[in-house]
Amino acid sequence: MSQKSYLFNVKGKVQRVGFRFHTAHNALKLGLTGYARNQEDGSVEVLVCGSKDKINQFLEWLQVGPQLARVDSIKQEETQWQELTDFKMY
Protein backbone atom coordinates (compact mmCIF):
# COMPACT_ATOMS: atom_id res chain seq x y z
CA MET A 1 0.00 0.00 0.00
CA SER A 2 1.39 3.36 -1.04
CA GLN A 3 1.85 5.93 1.72
CA LYS A 4 1.19 9.60 1.01
CA SER A 5 1.47 12.94 2.81
CA TYR A 6 -0.88 15.85 2.15
CA LEU A 7 -0.86 19.39 3.46
CA PHE A 8 -4.24 21.13 3.77
CA ASN A 9 -4.97 24.77 4.55
CA VAL A 10 -8.51 25.08 5.87
CA LYS A 11 -10.23 28.48 5.88
CA GLY A 12 -13.49 29.55 7.47
CA LYS A 13 -14.61 29.54 11.09
CA VAL A 14 -11.99 26.98 12.12
CA GLN A 15 -10.36 28.49 15.21
CA ARG A 16 -11.88 28.51 18.73
CA VAL A 17 -14.46 25.87 17.73
CA GLY A 18 -12.57 22.66 18.63
CA PHE A 19 -11.42 22.18 15.05
CA ARG A 20 -7.90 20.93 15.83
CA PHE A 21 -9.13 18.54 18.54
CA HIS A 22 -11.76 16.99 16.25
CA THR A 23 -9.28 16.91 13.36
CA ALA A 24 -6.80 14.95 15.49
CA HIS A 25 -9.53 12.60 16.73
CA ASN A 26 -10.76 11.82 13.21
CA ALA A 27 -7.25 11.40 11.82
CA LEU A 28 -6.26 8.99 14.60
CA LYS A 29 -9.52 7.06 14.16
CA LEU A 30 -8.46 6.46 10.53
CA GLY A 31 -4.89 5.53 11.50
CA LEU A 32 -3.37 8.71 10.06
CA THR A 33 -0.48 10.70 11.51
CA GLY A 34 0.41 14.39 11.19
CA TYR A 35 -0.59 17.63 12.87
CA ALA A 36 -3.11 20.47 12.98
CA ARG A 37 -1.77 23.97 13.59
CA ASN A 38 -3.53 27.34 13.91
CA GLN A 39 -2.24 29.99 11.51
CA GLU A 40 -2.06 33.73 12.16
CA ASP A 41 -4.53 34.43 9.33
CA GLY A 42 -7.27 32.43 11.12
CA SER A 43 -6.89 29.28 9.03
CA VAL A 44 -5.72 25.85 10.19
CA GLU A 45 -2.84 23.98 8.55
CA VAL A 46 -3.28 20.21 8.58
CA LEU A 47 -0.66 17.63 7.58
CA VAL A 48 -1.85 14.04 7.22
CA CYS A 49 0.24 10.98 6.42
CA GLY A 50 -1.06 7.53 5.55
CA SER A 51 -2.76 5.56 2.79
CA LYS A 52 -4.47 7.45 -0.01
CA ASP A 53 -7.87 5.86 0.69
CA LYS A 54 -7.74 6.83 4.38
CA ILE A 55 -6.66 10.37 3.46
CA ASN A 56 -9.63 10.59 1.07
CA GLN A 57 -11.98 9.51 3.89
CA PHE A 58 -10.37 12.12 6.15
CA LEU A 59 -10.79 14.82 3.49
CA GLU A 60 -14.53 14.05 3.28
CA TRP A 61 -14.78 14.80 7.01
CA LEU A 62 -12.44 17.83 6.76
CA GLN A 63 -14.71 19.47 4.16
CA VAL A 64 -17.46 19.65 6.79
CA GLY A 65 -15.47 19.77 10.05
CA PRO A 66 -16.97 19.65 13.55
CA GLN A 67 -20.44 20.96 14.34
CA LEU A 68 -19.41 24.46 15.49
CA ALA A 69 -17.02 25.04 12.56
CA ARG A 70 -17.70 26.43 9.11
CA VAL A 71 -15.30 25.33 6.36
CA ASP A 72 -15.23 27.83 3.48
CA SER A 73 -12.29 26.46 1.47
CA ILE A 74 -9.49 23.92 1.56
CA LYS A 75 -6.21 24.18 -0.33
CA GLN A 76 -4.54 20.82 -0.81
CA GLU A 77 -1.08 19.77 -1.93
CA GLU A 78 0.76 16.49 -1.87
CA THR A 79 4.05 16.75 0.01
CA GLN A 80 7.05 14.52 0.48
CA TRP A 81 6.27 11.44 2.62
CA GLN A 82 6.95 12.01 6.31
CA GLU A 83 7.34 9.08 8.69
CA LEU A 84 5.44 10.35 11.74
CA THR A 85 4.22 8.31 14.70
CA ASP A 86 1.36 10.41 16.10
CA PHE A 87 -1.05 13.24 15.36
CA LYS A 88 -0.27 16.48 17.20
CA MET A 89 -2.02 19.78 17.76
CA TYR A 90 -0.11 23.07 17.78
From Swiss-Prot:
EC number: 3.6.1.7
Alphabetical list of PROSITE patterns matching this protein: ACYLPHOSPHATASE_2 (PS00151), ACYLPHOSPHATASE_3 (PS51160)
Molecular function GO terms recorded: acylphosphatase activity
Residue ranges of domain Acylphosphatase-like in the record: 5-90
SUPFAM superfamilies from the UniProt entry: Acylphosphatase/BLUF domain-like
Signal peptide: none
Active site: residue positions: 20, 38
Alphabetical list of Pfam families matching this protein: Acylphosphatase (PF00708)
InterPro entries linked: Acylphosphatase (IPR020456), Acylphosphatase-like_dom (IPR001792), Acylphosphatase-like_dom_sf (IPR036046), Acylphosphatase_CS (IPR017968)
Keywords: Hydrolase
Reactions it catalyzes: an acyl phosphate + H2O = a carboxylate + phosphate + H(+)
Disulfide bonds: none
EC category: hydrolase
Family in the record: Belongs to the acylphosphatase family.
PANTHER family referenced in this protein's UniProt entry, alphabetically: ACYLPHOSPHATASE
Protein name, as recorded: Acylphosphatase
